[in-house]
């Protein structure tokens, strides 16, 4: 059923795209009529398309996302950097805790740290 819905959606998009394209005229009446038709087209080409603006914004957004994804730390070094960025008054320095408490271990309130 999912495949059928996707197929219908694809066909609808293709049909809408085909209907949106201008139809070429089979019998031109003369060079004057052809020039009259080309003049508005030239004006339309000179006007910036509104559709290009969202595409440009989307492209810029994707470029920033890719740059951030490349700069993002990964692996063990990112865990160490996260540990170093913790507040110095944070009493638990074990990398396994990272702000949460395992019920199998002694709680931070019960244990007095010497540091």
From Swiss-Prot:
The modification Sulfotyrosine is found at residues 97, 113. One of its GO terms (molecular function) is neuropeptide hormone activity. PROSITE patterns: GASTRIN. Residues 21-44, 107-115 form a propeptide. GO terms for cellular component: axon; extracellular space. The modification Phenylalanine amide is found at residue 103. This peptide hormone induces gall bladder contraction and the release of pancreatic enzymes in the gut. Its function in the brain is not clear. Binding to CCK-A receptors stimulates amylase release from the pancreas, binding to CCK-B receptors stimulates gastric acid secretion. Binds to CCK-A receptors in the pancreas and CCK-B receptors in the brain. This is Cholecystokinin. It comes from Bos taurus.
